Regions:
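Membrane-interface junctions at the ends of membrane-embedded or membrane-associated helices
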Residues: 1-5, 150-152, 196-212
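Short helix- or helix-capping micro-motifs
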Residues: 16-17, 161-166, 193
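Hydrophobic core segments of transmembrane alpha-helices in multi-pass, intramembrane catalytic enzymes
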Residues: 39, 45, 138, 180, ...
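Transmembrane-helix signature of polytopic, membrane-embedded enzymes
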Residues: 8-10, 90-91, 97-117, 121, ...
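Interfacial juxtamembrane loops and adjacent helix segments
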Residues: 45-133
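Short acidic/glycine- and proline-prone juxtamembrane loop motifs at membrane-interface regions
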Residues: 170-183
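Transmembrane signal-anchor helices characteristic of membrane glycosylation enzymes that use polyprenol
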Residues: 6-37, 48-63, 86-90
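Specific aromatic-rich, kink-prone transmembrane helix
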Residues: 143-147, 183-203
Length: 212
């Protein structure tokens, strides 16, 4: 298979990864993933006050469980959703987000899969832009893993490695929810890809010196 065809397949893989995650972002019920409310709240607070929240003033141990995390994803999600209007808050931190719980959640096997009600892209758009931000980071992780595999084992192996990661149900699920796990995956994949680049470049340099 030619290099151009491998590159085209890699682009298709990344496009499918992003499409699957975005579909999950809008199909998944709001707050259906663990700690999504706390993660989303962190993003919204950053938009409300225009900076990182003052963690020393956190009034809830539950909120602090997420707010002590590194702000990489939360900052990226807040910037990605800048086009979404958010009412500013003079308090730092602002009061916790209140969402109406679904009293019939999981009460019947046929439905009631929404933990909360009256939450959708129209009235809570920042939640969905934050989910799409996670999807983008998921694509970045797949791209970095593909690059690492390609450098070591060739383009076909890189595609296989990227595909295995991209289409894991858990990975797609995380890519469609507000969480701080996707940036960790992306950073680890990028570091691994860069390490592979350094090792292979150094190996080629040593081989060239021996030939000389």
């Amino acid at each position: 298979m030619t290099i151009c065809r491998h590159r085209a397949l890699a682009v298709v893989l990344l496009a499918l990864t992003f499409a699957a995650a975005v579909h999950m972002a809008f199909a998944l019920p709001p707050l259906a993933t663990p700690n999504e409310l706390l993660n989303f709240e962190y993003v919204q607070v950053m938009r409300q006050i225009g900076s990182l929240p003052n963690r020393g003033l956190v009034d809830s141990e539950v909120r602090y469980t997420e707010w002590h995390q590194p702000p990489l994803y939360f900052t990226f999600a807040a910037l990605f959703g800048l086009s979404v209007p958010v009412e500013p808050s003079a308090a730092n931190p602002p009061p916790p987000i209140e969402m109406q719980a679904n009293p019939h959640y999981l009460s019947t096997p046929a439905g009631n899969r929404n933990p909360v009600v009256h939450v959708n892209p129209a009235n809570t758009p920042l939640l969905y832009t934050s989910r799409v931000a996670a999807a983008l980071l998921g694509v970045l992780g797949v791209a970095a893993l593909y690059a690492a595999g390609k450098r070591v084992l060739g383009p076909a192996a890189g595609l296989l490695m990227g595909s295995i990661l991209a289409f894991q149900p858990t990975y797609i699920h995380l890519g469609g929810s507000v969480n701080n796990d996707m940036p960790l995956t992306a950073v680890v994949a990028m570091v691994m890809s860069y390490a592979v680049l350094l090792v292979t470049s150094d190996g080629r340099r040593v081989a060239s010196e021996k030939e000389i």
